[in-house]
Amino acid sequence: MSSCSVTYGNKEIQDEVLVAKIKAGEYSKPMLYERLGQPSDVKSGSNRESRWIYRFRKADNDMFAYAPMGAGLLIGGKNGDVLTRTFYFNSNGILENATYSVEKLYTSNLMSLGRTIRANLDSNDSQKRVENEMKVIGKPFDSDLAADNQKLEDALSSD
């Protein structure tokens, strides 16, 4: 039985050579956008500081995902790693620091289906935050990319 891999998010953040060129004190928000594209989420601090969060996930179906007669939806899921890179900006929009982390994430197929249905019905805060930030820095906002990123953000907050 072969495994089915899926990927979500920004593949660029896996590239250590590319990311190593991003230097604190030298990079502005528009420069980071040009290097890595639109972030998955944007969070603001109390003194106009902010952080841009980029995520990438690669996941494989578990053995239960292939169960016959629709049982895979009920008992199957995906196992994978989520790589997160967070870039911290000062109040002038200059990069101060960057961090990365990797965490394991299991997502059940049934929960994924539920999140997809909810995402089509609800408004999504991370998409709004990213859209607002793109307006502030004068860069285009990709709503389709934001919707895909929202699914990963939701998986991290609910599974």
Put a short name on every predicted segment.
Residues 1-3:
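C-terminal motif of bacterial Sec signal peptides marking the signal peptidase cleavage site
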Residues 5-159:
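Residues within mature, well-folded domains
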